[in-house]
From Swiss-Prot:
Domain of life: Bacteria
Listed Low complexity bias regions: 236-258
GO-annotated cellular components: cytosolic small ribosomal subunit
Positions of the UniProt region annotated as Disordered: 234-258
Gene: rpsB
Species of origin: Desulfovibrio desulfuricans (strain ATCC 27774 / DSM 6949 / MB)
Protein name: Small ribosomal subunit protein uS2
Lineage of origin: Bacteria, Pseudomonadati, Thermodesulfobacteriota, Desulfovibrionia, Desulfovibrionales
Gene Ontology biological-process annotations: translation
Amino acid sequence: MAYVSMKQMLETGVHFGHQTRRWNPKMRPYIFGARNGIHIIDLQQTVKLFRIAHDKVVDIVAKGGKVLFIGTKRQAQEAVAAEAGRAGQFFVTNRWMGGTLTNFVTIQKSVDRLKKLESMFADGSINRYQKKEILLLERELAKLEETLGGIKNMDRLPQIAFIIDPHREDIAVKECRKLGIPIIAVTDTNCDPDVIDYIIPGNDDAIRAIKLFVAAFAEACMEGEAMGKDHKGETANAEEAMQKAAAVEAAAEAAPAQ
């Protein structure tokens, strides 16, 4: 288990919340105190709650589930795209398109368009168009890739969402809740924890803090995937052993009595 330690959280500034005047009173249970007008988050709770969320991700991925990483703020975009991609999971780092989850069928039509354009540029069939048309199609492809590139292989809804800053990603939160998709979120002191299933109280603005959590959940995904493969291997071996035993038993029954 690759848990994040309290030392790592302190070093990356996870404990720094927002200004005390910019807070959601519902976050009071997760606040240790205040210093120079800034709320300080109780990292003992963050460590405990992180482990719960981490184990949930491992379990879901081990059972064949997928995670959707969401982080459209500038500080999160690079880390979310890199780490989710490394773990083979889905991600949204540009603007969240309303209906990405709740209007999944319609979004898939745009994804199909993206894949078609990619194919046309890859196999050279795009060259049957005039240069001006090709330029327009290049721009369309770039825009679709920017918006949908991280979910173009998402052929079904994710089993869980991991969100950086649920206050900013409120539309994504609403869509997940409407569809019953559990939410894990790095939740700063200005957020509403009531709409999050697995809250991780922490700084959702500092790049180092964001990278710490995103990388940790990418590792959780890969750990779950490895566990799933091991389980499939064990199941296959058990089934093979049962088949061999059945064959031996059948052969023994078919043999003439001495």
